[in-house]
Amino acid sequence: ILQFWLTFLAKEKFKGITYEIIADPTGNKINRLRVHVDSKISKFTIQSLSYHLEKNNPAIFVRDDLIHLNHFELDTCNLKKGQERVVMNELKKIILQLNSRKIKNNISQKEYSIKSNKEWLSWLN
């Protein structure tokens, strides 16, 4: 899965987006894809990308623990066969929408935290 993602991203050559494979920080025997966004080059924030991926249909959930450092991680452990393509196709779709400003592309860390907390707590209602 990770090799497919690396190949896909290398072909797309998204400006301001870099990526790397990292070991799972919890010690599990899996690797993750860490996605970095340089908003000065990409013209959108990592928070915008993460937010719109999670609001997408289908939703693509990211590991956003360190999003304030301008990166998130994609985890492969819960994907079923073929879903790795869906993840990349939806990532591409969201990036193109962010680049064309069809969706909000300047979500700040503060705004992202507020939106995330509201969504997280919305199930209480």
Task: Enumerate the predicted regions with their spans.
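Structural signature of PLP-dependent enzymes
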Residues: 1-7
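Conserved C-terminal alpha-helix-loop-beta "cap" of PLP-dependent enzymes
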Residues: 8-107
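Structural signal for terminal/edge beta-strands and the immediately following C-terminal loop/tail
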Residues: 97-125
